[in-house]
């Protein structure tokens, strides 16, 4: 039986990161993890800073690191992701992401009152999302 496809668009203020047909999506929303297939009920939800994955029409799993504020809009035939930043896993330099994670952890462990802890936590979450997306893709290859 053929898998039903639907359009996925991942858009940031700078570019269209992805625009093509997919057969499924897995995303981390504020309310929990979502699985989306063709003909899903309409939905709008806020995304967490986390890896986002989808299965292409060719059956390949692709991973994306979603960062910053992001929203997911689902209609029966199309899913649109609007987010501050998004990187496809092959665009992520794993070493740089690991260095960013270490820097964020060091800032969070410091007892300096000048540190913006919420910003450091966001940096840590962003680095972890990038690492997870990059590693997931490398494990699939």
From Swiss-Prot:
It is found in: Cell membrane. It is a peripheral membrane protein. SUPFAM superfamilies: Epsilon subunit of F1F0-ATP synthase C-terminal domain, Epsilon subunit of F1F0-ATP synthase N-terminal domain. Its main location: membrane. The keyword Transport applies. The keyword Transport applies. It comes from the Bacteria. It holds the Pfam family ATP-synt_DE. InterPro entries: ATP_F1_dsu/esu_C_sf, ATP_synth_F1_dsu/esu, ATP_synth_F1_dsu/esu_N, ATP_synth_F1_esu_C, ATPsynth_dsu/esu_N. Signal peptide: none annotated. GO terms for cellular component: plasma membrane; proton-transporting ATP synthase complex. Gene3D superfamilies: ATP synthase delta/epsilon subunit, C-terminal domain, F0F1 ATP synthase delta/epsilon subunit, N-terminal. Keywords: ATP synthesis, Cell membrane, CF(1), Hydrogen ion transport, Ion transport, Membrane, Transport. GO terms for molecular function: ATP binding; proton-transporting ATP synthase activity, rotational mechanism. F-type ATPases have 2 components, CF(1) - the catalytic core - and CF(0) - the membrane proton channel. CF(1) has five subunits: alpha(3), beta(3), gamma(1), delta(1), epsilon(1). CF(0) has three main subunits: a, b and c. HAMAP family: ATP_synth_epsil_bac (MF_00530). Belongs to the ATPase epsilon chain family. Produces ATP from ADP in the presence of a proton gradient across the membrane. This is ATP synthase epsilon chain. It comes from Natranaerobius thermophilus (strain ATCC BAA-1301 / DSM 18059 / JW/NM-WN-LF).
């Amino acid at each position: 039986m053929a898998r039903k496809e639907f359009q996925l668009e991942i858009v940031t203020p700078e570019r269209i990161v992805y625009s093509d047909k997919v057969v499924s999506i897995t995303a981390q929303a504020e309310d929990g993890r979502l699985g989306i297939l063709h003909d899903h009920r309409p939905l709008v939800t806020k995304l967490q800073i986390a890896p986002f994955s989808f299965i292409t029409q060719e059956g390949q799993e692709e991973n994306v690191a979603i960062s910053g504020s992001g929203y997911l809009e689902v209609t029966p035939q199309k899913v649109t992701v609007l987010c501050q930043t998004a990187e496809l896993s092959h665009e992520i330099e794993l070493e740089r992401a690991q260095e960013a994670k270490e820097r964020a952890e060091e800032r969070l462990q410091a007892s300096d009152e000048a540190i913006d802890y919420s910003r450091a936590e966001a940096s840590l979450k962003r680095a972890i999302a990038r690492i997870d997306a990059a590693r997931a893709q490398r494990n699939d290859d």
